[in-house]
Amino acid sequence: LDGVEVWNSRAERKIADANSLAEAFAREHGLRRFAGSDAHVPQEIGHGVTVIQAEACTLEAVKAALLRGGARIQGCRSRAWHTARSQLTKRKKTKAGPVAYAKWAAFALKCCAQDLIRKGDGTDVTDR
């Protein structure tokens, strides 16, 4: 059962059209479409989901539903602040120095600004 993750709630932080590129690839190659939260903090869980309309909650029923196209993509872009938080955790775990924390502070400010600018920008996706 082959497919492509066409919605990742964090992917567009690094590559602006990452999800669109994945969507185009899936369509071009006739692959099933999936979504993922890529959650690094609890608040991101569920920001990308594949909703499957299966007859029962069994592996066989889920596989059959996916094979017949019984899945929808739902999600929303994760807030930039969550990315900043996960980067702070990374710095703490690696015992980063002051320069790394200064870079993080600048990154965190950028993330906060992005969240303010993008608030309500229509980034929710429902089976696009």
For the regions a language model picked out, list residue spans one by one:
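Charged catalytic cores and adjacent phosphate/nucleic-acid-binding surfaces used
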Residues: 1-128
